Amino acid sequence: MGLIVYYSSRSENTHRFVAKLGLRAARIPPSGAAGAFHIREPFVLIVPTYSGDGGKGAVPKQVIRFLNDAENRGHIRGVIAAGNSNFGETYGLAGDVVSQKCQVPYLYRFELLGTEADVANVKHGMERFWTREHL
C-alpha cells in the first residue's frame, strides 16, 4: 500500500486522525523545513484546511512549500482534507485547491478529528485505492 503524507499544526488534529488509521505515514515538518522534506514514492496527502478571508490561505504554507518541489508533486496520487463545517463553503477547501492544482482526485473530507466512521472510510478507501493503478 502507498504512503500517507500529512501536515498537522500544533493542534495535532490531523496527526491524531492519521495515527488512528494505523497506516504507513510521513509528516510534513511544521517548521520552514518543509522545502527540504522529500518523498520519493507515491502518496496520498492529508491536509487540514485553514479558513481565511474568502478562502485565501486555505492550504498551509508548509504544504505549499512541500508541493512546490516538482519531485514531491510528481508522486502525489490523491488528497484528503480536514476542515471545520462551521466555515461553510470553505469546509475542506484545501482539498479542492490541491486536487485542482496537482490534477489528482479529491478522495475524502472529514471534520476536525474525524469520527470512527471517517477513520474506517479512509482506511478501507486507501486499501481499495492502492490496489488499483495508483502506484
From Swiss-Prot:
InterPro entries xref list: Flavoprotein-like_sf, RNR_Ib_NrdI_bac, RNR_NrdI
Protein's name in the database: Protein NrdI
Native species: Rhizobium johnstonii (strain DSM 114642 / LMG 32736 / 3841) (Rhizobium leguminosarum bv. viciae)
NCBIfam families: nrdI
Gene3D superfamilies: 3.40.50.360
Pfam families membership: Flavodoxin_NdrI (PF07972)
Family: Belongs to the NrdI family.
Gene Ontology molecular function, alphabetical: FMN binding
Function: Probably involved in ribonucleotide reductase function.
GO biological process, one term: protein modification process
